[in-house]
Amino acid sequence: MKTLGNIPVIKIESQIFEKLEKNINSKFKMEKLDNSSKRLLPILKELKAVTDSMVNYYGKKEHLADGFAKGQQLHTNFLKIYKRYKESSDAFKMEVANKSKERMQKILETYKNEGSLIKYNLTILINSCEDFVDKMDNQKLSMTTFIKGDLGKLKKAQQNILVASANFQKAIANEKQLKKENYTKERLEIFNKQLAEFEKSVTIFIKEIEKSKSMSKSEIEKKVYTEDMAGTPNDVIKKYNKLVNDYNNLMN
């Protein structure tokens, strides 16, 4: 999204077409994902043609001369194409997610078959943490709306983290397993410290939502959260990003 004057206009970069075409023409064929890409590509090109016209139209300030006459038609065309784009884009994202799940399942099976129980449980744990963050994102929870989050879904995701965390701690308590996978207690301690920070932030996050359920509308409106407060969406994501960094260090 770019702004021309005070008017926001979507700009689609050409590189996205190159990436889709490269994936479609790849020697590694994935039928469902390739088909989703093939459906998405022409619609995306249509959308780019309209958005490029909008950028040109507003960039040259033609809207000031014709009283937005052409602009109205461009916006009408954009909305028609965007509806088709949204449907194809959602299908494409679903296929990407499915492929990602398949790939992760193969990785987990490999770890399990080779007896790498620490890596196995660590991968499940980080996926559980990612799932919690995804549920926050799917509910579009922000600093001002997060206390309205779906408590049931979020608590279930939190419970998955706690179960995965407990299994991971059991795995790293085995001295023979540590030696087999070439891990030291010092390296794992760094990860565990950040894991505790993330779990604490998630716990506070959940408690804030629970408390809001018994608050009146006026009490909720008076409640003020700052970005650096523990348990806010920003804090959860900040702690999660640090955890992912420590996870990557462990896996390398």
List each language-model region with its residue ranges.
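Post-signal peptide N-terminal segment of secreted/secretory-pathway proteins
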Residues: 1-66
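Amphipathic alpha-helical coiled-coil segments
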Residues: 10-20, 54, 80-93, 163-171, ...
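Secondary-structure edge/capping motif, primarily at the C-terminal ends of alpha-helices
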Residues: 23-27, 51-65, 99, 103, ...
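Solvent-exposed, polar/charged alpha-helical surfaces in well-ordered, non-transmembrane soluble domains
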Residues: 35-38, 42-45, 49-52, 76-83, ...
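A short acidic/glycine-rich loop-to-helix N-cap element
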Residues: 66-76
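Extended amphipathic alpha-helical interaction segments
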Residues: 75-195
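A cross-kingdom marker for long, charged
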Residues: 153-252
